């Protein structure tokens, strides 16, 4: 007998508390595949699960890539590092494809409210961005898909959501990171981040009490990135790990 949605959600919550994010993602994938529109709680559980699952691989990939570069001159060590990097890349690729399939087949099409649509399109932009970080052959196509999803989300967010809404702010944060890291256009990244920050500051009185903490945190991250990027415009060797991203 298959688990009910309630049981799967409870399983996901248990897995989160135990920090077993692969189990959490597997449970929320099953919830999504039931074909019903997710509640806000379910949506956030899905996002947190996959963010942690993919985040672990992104972190591993960066470490291994760095080791691979440092082993130049030792052919055997470099080959071992390369093989391990390719293994992690495949895992990362599989996870991203899983998420993108859920988004295209279930989540985006079922999203009724503008908030949900923006959330899922931002997520689509994020996971294509993660693919772009490690892609080589089809990178241009992946980058284009990421930019298209982010832009569609931003168009809806600007039309339907307050500038202080945490999802709109998180979208601006991650889209600006995309411009900085993936397209290597710091001026565009700064412009997008500054616009989002300024728009939110101008409408601070619209801050929802429930999301006050989330909104102000993301505004701080936008400002942190702006500080980092404006000091870095013209410099070529900035470590990308310093760039802040939105959690969900």
From Swiss-Prot:
GO terms for biological process: asymmetric protein localization involved in cell fate determination; cell fate specification; determination of adult lifespan; embryo development ending in birth or egg hatching; establishment of mitotic spindle orientation; first cell cycle pseudocleavage; heat acclimation; maintenance of protein location in nucleus. The keyword Repeat does not apply. It comes from the Eukaryota. Pfam families: 14-3-3. Keywords: Cytoplasm, Nucleus. This is 14-3-3-like protein 1. The keyword Nucleus applies. It is found in: Cytoplasm; Nucleus. GO terms for cellular component: cell cortex; cytoplasm; nucleus. Required to modulate lifespan, in concert with hcf-1, acting redundantly with 14-3-3-like protein ftt-2. PANTHER family: 14-3-3 PROTEIN. Belongs to the 14-3-3 family. Transmembrane segments: none annotated. Interacts with daf-16 and sir-2.1. Interacts with atgl-1. Interacts with hcf-1.
């Amino acid at each position: 007998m298959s688990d009910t949605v309630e049981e799967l959600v409870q399983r996901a919550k248990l897995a989160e508390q135990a920090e077993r994010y692969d189990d959490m993602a597997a449970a929320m994938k099953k919830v999504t595949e039931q074909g019903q529109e997710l509640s806000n709680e379910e949506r956030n559980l899905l996002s947190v699960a996959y963010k942690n699952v993919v985040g672990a691989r992104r972190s591993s990939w960066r470490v291994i890539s760095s080791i691979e570069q440092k082993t130049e001159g030792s052919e055997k060590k470099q080959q071992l590092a390369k093989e391990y990097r390719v293994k992690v890349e495949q895992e990362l690729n599989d996870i991203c494809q899983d998420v993108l399939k859920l988004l295209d087949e279930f989540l985006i099409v079922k999203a009724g409210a503008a908030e949900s649509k923006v959330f899922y399109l931002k997520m689509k932009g994020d996971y294509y961005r993660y693919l772009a970080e490690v892609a080589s052959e089809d990178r241009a196509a992946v980058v284009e898909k990421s930019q298209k999803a982010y832009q569609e989300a931003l168009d809806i967010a600007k039309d339907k959501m307050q500038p202080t809404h945490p999802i709109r702010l998180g979208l601006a944060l991650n889209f600006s990171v995309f411009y900085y890291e993936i397209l290597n256009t710091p001026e565009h990244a700064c412009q997008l981040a500054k616009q989002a920050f300024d728009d939110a500051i101008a409408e601070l009185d619209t801050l929802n009490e429930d999301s006050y903490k989330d909104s102000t945190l993301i505004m701080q991250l936008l400002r942190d990135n702006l500080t980092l990027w404006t000091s870095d415009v013209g410099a070529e060797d900035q470590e990308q790990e310093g760039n802040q991203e939105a959690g969900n």
